[in-house]
Amino acid sequence: MTARPLSELVERGWAAALEPVADQVAHMGQFLRAEIAAGRRYLPAGSNVLRAFTFPFDNVRVLIVGQDPYPTPGHAVGLSFSVAPDVRPWPRSLANIFDEYTADLGYPLPSNGDLTPWAQRGVLLLNRVLTVRPSNPASHRGKGWEAVTECAIRALAARAAPLVAILWGRDASTLKPMLAAGNCVAIESPHPSPLSASRGFFGSRPFSRANELLVGMGAEPIDWRLP
């Protein structure tokens, strides 16, 4: 991640929303450069670390929270749960998300694991921790990203615009108090990981429920269809 002003790294609305933690973003850039200098790599690629914030802040209607990026080299792309179009097999959490997607919405399985269309249509795919060491899950937790992503979530919640937060798992559910302000509703269920998907994620209908809530709040529903 290069040392550049926040306004050059993220979308204009996000630059304003994240201004209170601009120094922390710069600090995290220094942390990542120090990791590289020490011979330690990180994921995703530097240009994708803040990718979730390159889509318009004002367009966000749904928030889907992940924990940290996929630690498998080649998987993390800067959007929670998403992978590059050429990645196969899909990570098991993503495969379970797609199983629920087809069951909930009746759409066929997507042709690939790229969730960029959701991001383009108003879904913020945000990991609480934005980087990870390859093959070392949770290795960057507690290093400082949480302050950045919590600022982002509070900024979304403070808007007057409707927001549906899809909170999968216990870690994501701890964010619920931050969403108490504004016009926000949370959908909670177990995480789509293989360890917990059968305990209530399957059958939770997060996509159709999110749209029902958005329409009820006077907002446009999300077009969830993937190619």
From Swiss-Prot:
Gene Ontology CC entries for this record: cytoplasm
Family as reported in the entry's similarity comment: Belongs to the uracil-DNA glycosylase (UDG) superfamily. UNG family.
This enzyme's EC code(s): 3.2.2.27
Major location (coarse): cytoplasm
Stated name of the protein: Uracil-DNA glycosylase
Protein keywords: Cytoplasm, DNA damage, DNA repair, Hydrolase
Record localization: Cytoplasm
Biological process according to GO: base-excision repair; base-excision repair, AP site formation via deaminated base removal
Keyword Translocase: no
Function statement: Excises uracil residues from the DNA which can arise as a result of misincorporation of dUMP residues by DNA polymerase or due to deamination of cytosine.
InterPro entries in the record: UDG_fam1, Ura-DNA_Glyclase_AS, Uracil-DNA_glycosylase-like, Uracil-DNA_glycosylase-like_sf
Enzyme class: hydrolase
Top-level taxon in the UniProt lineage: Bacteria
Active site per database record: D68 (proton acceptor)
Molecular function (Gene Ontology), one example: uracil DNA N-glycosylase activity
PANTHER family, sorted: URACIL-DNA GLYCOSYLASE (PTHR11264:SF0)
Signal peptide limits: none
UniProt KW Acyltransferase keyword: no
Pfam families for this protein: UDG (PF03167)
Gene designation per UniProt: ung
Catalytic activity: Hydrolyzes single-stranded DNA or mismatched double-stranded DNA and polynucleotides, releasing free uracil
